[in-house]
């Protein structure tokens, strides 16, 4: 099986590369290393090729889809706050990048995509636990809007061009190689000052997490 993993040098993507290699896939990682790290893949001595390419550049990235069996699309802007400061960040790195992926798949006859979406597509008012068919999705961040748009692009390429697509709405992933997030910040604050613990709100908030290996 020849697989592409976009964003495969990132936190979640690199763990997915590990899993694909363990089952014998030949993996092509497309990553511009803006947030991903080549060292996350350095332990692979075979079956992994890292291509430093920006998937917002259609002409540069599209030829790599020739002869591929499946695409795992993880690449996106990992910094939600950045999107509020430079407001076209998620449009380019999320929506347009996802268009480039599915259109490259159409051109090169790649049959299957796994799209890494996010629970942020639901917005603030979703019931907990959230049923998969809850809707409409009302994202309240630009990142969430780009993920929602990405889901729609995948769905429309499935309906129009016969692509096979799977969408996963990840939430609060933690584990080795993580570079940011609530738990990451919490642990590093305690490491810097073990005698002081900052408590937000009343301290009774609850949040579910998933370990990246799961």
Show where each model-derived region lies.
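N-terminal Rossmann-like NAD(P)+-binding domain of SDR-like oxidoreductases, especially those catalyzing
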Residues: 1-173
């Amino acid at each position: 099986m020849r697989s592409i993993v976009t964003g495969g040098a990132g936190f979640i993507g690199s763990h997915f590369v590990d899993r694909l290699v363990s089952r014998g896939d030949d993996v092509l990682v497309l990553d511009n290393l803006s947030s991903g790290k080549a060292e996350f893949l350095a332990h692979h001595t075979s079956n992994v090729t890292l291509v430093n390419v920006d998937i917002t550049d259609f002409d540069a990235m599209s030829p790599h889809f020739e002869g591929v069996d499946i695409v795992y699309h993880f690449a996106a802007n990992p910094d939600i706050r950045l999107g509020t400061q430079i407001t076209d960040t998620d449009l380019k790195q999320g929506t347009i990048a996802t268009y480039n992926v599915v259109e490259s798949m159409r051109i090169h006859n790649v049959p299957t995509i796994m799209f890494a979406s996010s629970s942020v597509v639901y917005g603030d008012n979703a019931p907990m636990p959230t049923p998969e068919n809850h809707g409409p999705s009302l994202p309240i961040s630009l990142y969430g809007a780009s993920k929602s748009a990405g889901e729609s692009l995948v769905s429309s390429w499935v309906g129009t061009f016969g692509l096979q697509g799977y969408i996963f709405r990840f939430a609060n992933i933690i584990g080795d190689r993580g570079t940011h997030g609530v738990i990451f910040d919490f642990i590093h604050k305690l490491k810097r000052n073990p005698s002081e613990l900052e408590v937000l709100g009343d301290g009774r908030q609850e949040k579910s997490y998933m370990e990246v290996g799961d």
